[in-house]
Swiss-Prot record:
Keyword Metal-binding: yes
UniProt keyword Iron-sulfur, yes or no: no
Role according to the record: Involved in the chlorophyll breakdown by its action in nonpolar primary fluorescent chlorophyll catabolite (pFCC) decarbonylation. Involved in the formation of major chlorophyll breakdown products, including non-fluorescent dioxobilin-type chlorophyll catabolites (NDCCs), during leaf senescence.
Molecular function GO terms recorded: fluorescent chlorophyll catabolite monooxygenase (deformylase) activity; heme binding; iron ion binding; NADPH-hemoprotein reductase activity; oxidoreductase activity, acting on paired donors, with incorporation or reduction of molecular oxygen, NAD(P)H as one donor, and incorporation of one atom of oxygen
Organism: Arabidopsis thaliana (Mouse-ear cress)
The protein's name in its UniProt record: Cytochrome P450 89A9
Reported consequences of knocking out the gene: Impaired accumulation of non-fluorescent dioxobilin-type chlorophyll catabolites (NDCCs) compensated by higher amounts of non-fluorescent chlorophyll catabolites (NCCs) in senescing leaves.
The family this protein is said to belong to: Belongs to the cytochrome P450 family.
Lineage of origin: Eukaryota, Viridiplantae, Streptophyta, Embryophyta, Tracheophyta
Length: 511
């Protein structure tokens, strides 16, 4: 009887202390400030009144009034936005394990990601670690990246041909982004499936990927009360599932073809996925299983999308800068001429091993990523448990995001931030040791930061340097007479592209 009483008292004391701790936690820490909200619908009415189409401008205005961390309510759940780089570092780097989770996916996203079985959407845990480790250790390690150098040269030849053809047929370049995306897709399809695909095959995969991409908005209504829409909107659900089935059919054709090959010159992403085993439960040493066909499709789709669009968009911005500011283009070219003095006429390509000598080129690319990051927000993060950031409550049931575009334009860290000035990334004419990972300090984060940082950021930087260097080495880029390069931005899916694509004439620099 005495032992039972003691155990009861201990349990009661612990329960009471936890209760008091929770009461104290929630009474001393409140959500970050934000605009007025209504029950159930949150801030939607307020956002519509304040030009929701310019969401970044709305957030910037709210931050100027409420401070560097604000709360919006879309429905009943809080969505927290951070504009301050120090708070971003505190969350993503110093407390990365807490701020690295993902929310449960919406019904349509669950279909597209095979129930969150890709790197981007998977919750923070053993599955996410397994998928990310497979990509970084098998495909993105330096020796494997180097093995694909011939692939990059091949896609560069495709890109050059696209530009030369348009210049010859139209008299100028106006579809730069389409050409850049197309050439990058050739490269990424080769890295993914291990095969140089024909033009019609590439177009088929591109179309399947594009249709799934636009489905996020086209079928978003299916995520509203899904138990109801599955009954009332059966035809729309059927259309959406047929779209996914079509994508799976296209991609699995190349996955299955690769699985039948006994040898391959270079390891491709599909090779690693066919051999990968993923955990069936969170605990270490638990049971494992092979990926399903649908999961392989989701991972291949993620690989193609994540490595194509942001890189192509950044290249568009960089080449627009070259056209708008001829002096910057001249400096990039003169640097290459100096480095390769005496061999200009014989050298047809700037090789990857030469890129480390091109400090000014690297500075131009970093400045463009600062001024025009391909995405102005990260994907939504979620905390693993209720926590505090900047003195405010960050609840587990909400989401938190970080305004990448604003951090790269912070006048407290960047002098004259709206001016394009590559020299800020140079020290005595040499490229400075800039920490892109934000480990020591976040000054800008075009690839994110912390545990969820883009695993392919180094590959993306290599692609930007290699393709831009060769486009400037092969051609002089000039603005079309009577045209101006407009650097206004607009959101397109997840990337920030040029509102008005630039037009240019290209002139071969050597015969």
């Amino acid at each position: 009887m005495e032992i039972t009483t003691i155990i009861f008292l201990i349990i009661s004391s612990l329960t009471f202390s936890i209760f008091l701790k929770l009461i104290f936690f929630f009474s001393t820490h409140k959500l970050p400030p934000g605009p007025p909200r209504f029950p159930v619908i949150g801030n939607i009415i307020w956002l519509k009144k304040n030009n929701f189409s310019d969401f970044q401008g709305v957030l910037r205005d709210l931050a100027s009034r409420h401070g560097p961390i604000i709360t919006l309510h879309v429905g009943s759940k809080p969505s927290i936005w951070v504009t301050d780089r120090s708070l971003a570092h505190q969350a993503l780097v110093q407390n990365g394990a807490v701020f690295s989770d993902r929310s449960l996916a919406l019904p349509t996203t669950k279909v597209i990601t095979s129930n969150q079985h890709d790197i981007h959407s998977s919750v923070y845990g053993s599955l996410w670690r397994t998928l990310r480790r497979n990509l970084t250790s098998e495909i993105l390690q330096p020796s494997r990246v180097k093995a694909h150098a011939p692939s990059r040269k091949w896609s560069l030849e495709i890109l050059v041909d696209l530009f030369e053809t348009e210049q010859r047929e139209k008299g100028h370049i106006s579809d730069a982004l389409d050409h850049l995306r197309h050439a990058m897709f050739y490269l990424l399809a080769l890295m993914c499936f291990g095969e140089k695909l024909r033009k019609e095959e590439i177009r088929e995969i591109e179309e399947a990927q594009y249709q799934m991409l636009i489905s996020y908005t086209k079928f978003s209504v299916l995520n509203i009360f899904p138990s109801v829409t599955k009954f009332l909107l059966r035809r729309k659900w059927k259309e959406f599932l047929e779209l996914r089935k079509s994508q799976e059919s296209v991609i699995l054709r190349y996955v299955n073809a690769r699985s039948k090959e006994t040898t391959g010159d270079v390891l491709c992403y599909v090779d690693t996925l066919l051999n990968l085993e993923i955990p069936t439960e969170e605990k270490e040493g638990g049971k494992k299983r092979k990926l399903s066909d649908s999961e392989i499709v989701s991972l291949c789709s993620e690989f193609l999308n994540a490595a194509t669009d942001p890189t192509a968009t950044s290249m568009q911005w960089i080449m627009a800068i070259m056209v708008k500011y001829p002096e910057i283009q001249r400096k990039v070219y003169e640097e290459m001429k100096t480095v390769f003095a005496g061999e200009e006429e014989e050298r047809e390509e700037i090789r990857e091993e030469d890129l480390g000598k091109l400090s000014y080129l690297k500075a131009v690319i970093l400045e463009c990523l600062r001024r025009h990051p391909p995405g102005h927000y990260l994907s939504y993060h979620k905390v693993t448990h209720d926590t505090v950031l900047g003195g405010f409550l960050i609840p587990r049931q909400g989401t938190i995001n970080f305004m990448v575009g604003e951090m790269g334009r912070d006048p407290k860290i960047w002098e004259d931030p709206l001016t394009f000035k590559p020299e800020r990334f140079l020290e005595n004419g040499e490229a400075c040791d800039f920490d892109m990972t934000g480990t020591r300090e976040i000054k800008m984060m075009p690839f994110g930061a912390g545990r969820r940082m883009c695993p392919g950021y180094a590959l993306s930087l290599l692609h930007l340097e290699y393709y831009v260097a060769n486009l400037v080495w092969k051609f002089e880029w000039k603005c079309v007479e009577g045209e101006e390069v407009d650097l206004s931005e607009k959101q397109q899916f997840i990337t920030m592209v040029m509102k008005n694509p630039f037009k240019a004439n290209i002139y071969p620099r050597r015969k």
